[in-house]
Amino acid sequence: MNPVLLWFHQLGSPPTFDRFAARWAPVGFGLGLLTMAIGLYGALFVVPADYQQGDSFRILYIHVPAAWMSLFVYALMAVYAAIALIWRIKLCEILAMACAPIGALFTAVTLATGSIWGKPMWGTWWDWDPRLTSELVLLFLYLGVIGLNAAIEDRRNAARAAGFLAIVGVVLLPVIRYSVEWWNSLHQGATIKLFGESTMDSSMTWPLWVMVLATKFWFAGSLLQRSRADNLEREAGKDWARAAAGAPR
């Protein structure tokens, strides 16, 4: 068997995943805090004020990475859910459900920071703009997945039902991504592009990319931590799980 496939196969074992998550979750959190400190320092003290928005634009160094992550985490959740439904892989069920509260947090941060930025720029805390409205619907989808997963007593059936909802909700992602281009919108178009020329000066973009990296690291740490907790809960009757949780046998 291919070494990479063999590693993934072994990782599907609950005890192996527990050891992996216990080792690497703190690393993800540590790297996330370090890169976030660097990114925030650059955003607050190094980058000059915007010539149109003044210092108000600095909140975008939190808003933009959070918005990107709200979409990324949902897409990843749907992928895990699809794998779990097709191949009945328990670890993917756990990972999919662990994504939901993290993605909901990123979406809530996106909406909150967008409102804070919108008040001085648009003169209102909220507008039923296509981008804002679709992002709010995304938050409701996350909450729906969380609620459905919690409402069904059987853990595997709960994960499958919530995973199906997550897969159905994927159709919203392109709506959020292209809403500014498809409809008249107050929301500004993309100023930072992975491919193509960005409208923001390069001297102002490096803290943003550092913050994007910070959210990735933090997400990885949080995903591993939440998945490990769910894994231990499901395997609570096993000796290895008792030992890992520090409980007496």
Provide a role label for each language-model segment.
Residues 1-249:
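Polytopic transmembrane helical bundles with strong interfacial aromatic enrichment
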